[in-house]
Amino acid sequence: MAQMNFGGVTETVVTSKEFSLEKAREVLKNETIAVIGYGVQGPGQACNLRDNGFNVIVGQRPGKTYDKAVADGWVPGETLFSIEEAAEKGTILCMLLSDAGQIQQWPTIKQYLKPGKTLYYSHGFAINWSDRTGVIPPKDVDVIMVAPKGSGTSLRTMFCEGRGLNCSYAVYQDATGNAKEKTLAFGIGIGAGYMFETTFEREATSDLTGERGSLMGAIQGLLLAQYEVLREHGHSPSEAFNETVEELTQSLGPLFGAKGMDWMYANCSTTAQRGALDWAPRFHDAIKPVMEWLYYSVQTGNEARITIDANSKPDYRAGLEKELEAMRNQEMWRAGETVRKLRPENQDV
């Protein structure tokens, strides 16, 4: 464990220096890791674990996702099974189905949770809102979590590049006395950059807040608002998109991601610098009440209720596609499609 200062607050983190890959292999040497679900997080975690030398199998229903698993080298009947077979064979059952899928499959999964097995999550949703999901693990199994702070695709890409994606970790239930060791070993196995401790409740709450806030919901709302204002005042789609999205994603985002917002402010034009310093507090004051409202909606379980209710509707997928199609057809993103085609790396040489 390493002590690190995060903005004046000391936290304990774990990296491969404190918990080596060799130690992780030793901790999990007698385990059969069953990755249940090969959708979003499943491929990255399963392939990283396999490449790091762990005993991994995959459980997936037939369909396109099953075919993807085959294409990734998982062999039917050897390392690729039905969900039921994988759950029976596995000693660590990794619940990497969607939140809705976890609720649906729980009656099946719990049949195979024999004493001493481990139930693994990468999101606290099902456990934290168990009153709504019905997911209540038996007392004689370990319940652990490693939650990558990014997509499964990013986890795999960074692993293949020799880098790691930061992860939070938590132990909800330690029936064997070895739950924390298994958790840290699993984090190293999937290719964590560094790991920081949390709880299922804090992970679920912060994750839903982030997705609805600055990571997805708020950023779409902010970008669209600026784009619309520019267009309504006579700016072309190309100009509006470049000043709203392209410069952010291709130039500024990588800069403040690598060096910090303060560095970016210190290394831009004086005009941009002055304007940003003056307007940032106004946006903060306008947005913070909405963020507080959002956090309350998450914390009280309202967002979980909305998610579960929506996913339980038989026509949800059709309705979702209509919503995504509406976003896809927004002028801003149609303009963006053309802008992306014009990037040098997308030009025919």
PLM features: residue spans?
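Active-site-proximal catalytic alpha-helix in oxidoreductases
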Residues: 177-232, 238-256
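Small-residue helix-packing motif on alpha-helices
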Residues: 66, 86, 102, 237-241
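Structural motif
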Residues: 32-34, 55-57, 78, 91-95, ...
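Rossmann-like NAD(P)-binding element
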Residues: 61, 70-128, 136-151
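NAD(P)+-binding Rossmann beta1-loop-alpha1 motif at the extreme N-terminus of oxidoreductases
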Residues: 2-77
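NAD(P)-dependent Rossmann-like dehydrogenase/reductase catalytic/cofactor-binding core
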Residues: 2-6, 11-17, 232-349
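Rossmann-fold dinucleotide-binding core
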Residues: 120-212
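Gly/Ser/Thr-rich loops at beta-strand to alpha-helix junctions
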Residues: 38-43, 62-63, 100, 119, ...
